[in-house]
Amino acid sequence: AYTKQEGITNVSGYERFTGRANVTHQTDKVLLEANAMYTNSTQNVNNEGTSFASPIMCYAMTASPSTYPYNEDGSFSSNFPALNGANPIQTETYNYNRATINRFLGSMAATWTIWDNLKLKEAISYDFNQNNERIWWDPRSNDGRSSNGVYQRVMGNRGQLNTQTQLSYNKSFGLHNLDALVGFETEDYKYDYLYANGNQYPSYLP
């Protein structure tokens, strides 16, 4: 499946690819099941809050009908006195905030009918989520001017492994029903996070 959405601001948007597969196999006494899903998402956003790259903040709080983003020669205007000359269109042209997210969710299960309605089920599942974010504040923008450019990287990996063991039995005796279930479950969760930034760049980054 494919999804693409355009944001309400010039450089914002969302794109996603999703794939899914399911397999089931049944024999006389054994049921095998396997499921897998993979998603790749790319998201472009404007910085929010009170940053100079926040167009919503600028337009709603500081811009007026006399404000113009471009000069007559096509260059960016600095006629934004309330923002100390910061032009939000110039800022969003040079700055970026991009995130790529990969997620995998897979599971396998085997159910064995031992005798009559006595069943043993073993299941294992793994959920992995990876986030990779890149943020650039250009020296030509007010966000990065004082530091001569700021580049930030945020990386996070989340992994969760689950296993389940279930022994179940059900039986009907006339008007009576008997159900019994014994189970055991384990969970292993890991999270890795890395943040890094740098400034004082000798040139502009693309």
Each model region followed by its residue ranges:
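Transmembrane beta-strand segments that form the barrel wall of outer-membrane beta-barrel proteins
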Residues: 1-4
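A cytosolic small-molecule/anion-sensing beta-strand core signal
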Residues: 106
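An active-site-proximal structural segment forming one wall of the substrate-binding cleft
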Residues: 118
